[in-house]
Amino acid sequence: MNVLPCSINTLKGLYEISGVEVGQHFYWQIGGFQVHAQVLITSWVVIAILLGSAAIAVRNPQTIPTDGQNFFEYVLEFIRDVSKTQIGEEEYGPWVPFIGTLFLFIFVSNWSGALLPWRIIQLPHGELAAPTNDINTTVALALPTSVAYFYAGLTKKGLGYFGKYIQPTPILLPINVLEDFTKPLSLSFRLFGNILADELVVVVLVSLVPLVIPIPVMFLGLFTSGIQALIFATLAAAYIGESMEGHH
């Protein structure tokens, strides 16, 4: 019986799992500041993919849309529908670019973790991964969302916006304030946790069963990555709509 070789292979697999590093970062020293290079590099790649795809698809608009133009028109219509549903038919127009930018950046970032061979690029420390695999990125996406819904409420209602904090009774003031300031935390940690967990599960399964098991898990990861992008964009639009309506 080949019990001993199997045991050795199992131990090797467990050893490889223990070598999966989380939180290792590569920094650029710019002036007196340390800049998180991994996030910048992968974010620039994602932005380049988005800009390049859009430029190629719509560089020569046709009355009868081509396949690329048709696809981007469908994406735009989808984003408009999400914004209209959550914000309202009268108010959604100016917010479509913001919601669309969030959705597309998060969607492509999430998918890049599974589809782009980041690990081919060797770094002195750590390794490249999806931008949304890093808490810095998800917090950077959540904070402008918070600014956006405060701006939307103040623009629509002026200082009367803050009256919602004492509705329906002033006793709820601390809870209402806490609710607004925990929204960016829930947005950022939900996205970060799901994407990081997905990539770690794939790494662990690849180290144990390299050929068969990881493939369906990767497809499931692509599906959940798209859902996470939709959830983030939908919640951002819902928060903006809620701030302008003034009720929960």
UniProtKB/Swiss-Prot annotation:
CDD domains: ATP-synt_Fo_a_6. InterPro entries: ATP_syn_F0_a_bact/chloroplast, ATP_synth_F0_asu, ATP_synth_F0_asu_AS, F0_ATP_A_sf. One of its GO terms (cellular component) is proton-transporting ATP synthase complex. This is ATP synthase subunit a, chloroplastic. PROSITE patterns: ATPASE_A (PS00449). F-type ATPases have 2 components, CF(1) - the catalytic core - and CF(0) - the membrane proton channel. CF(1) has five subunits: alpha(3), beta(3), gamma(1), delta(1), epsilon(1). CF(0) has four main subunits: a, b, b' and c. Belongs to the ATPase A chain family. GO terms for molecular function: proton-transporting ATP synthase activity, rotational mechanism. The chain crosses the membrane at residues 38-58, 96-116, 135-155, 200-220, 221-241. It is a multi-pass membrane protein. SUPFAM superfamilies: F1F0 ATP synthase subunit A. Pfam families: ATP-synt_A. Its main location: plastid. It is found in: Plastid, Chloroplast thylakoid membrane. Disulfide bonds: none annotated. It comes from Nymphaea alba (White water-lily). Key component of the proton channel; it plays a direct role in the translocation of protons across the membrane. Keywords: ATP synthesis, CF(0), Chloroplast, Hydrogen ion transport, Ion transport, Membrane, Plastid, Thylakoid, Transmembrane, Transmembrane helix, Transport.
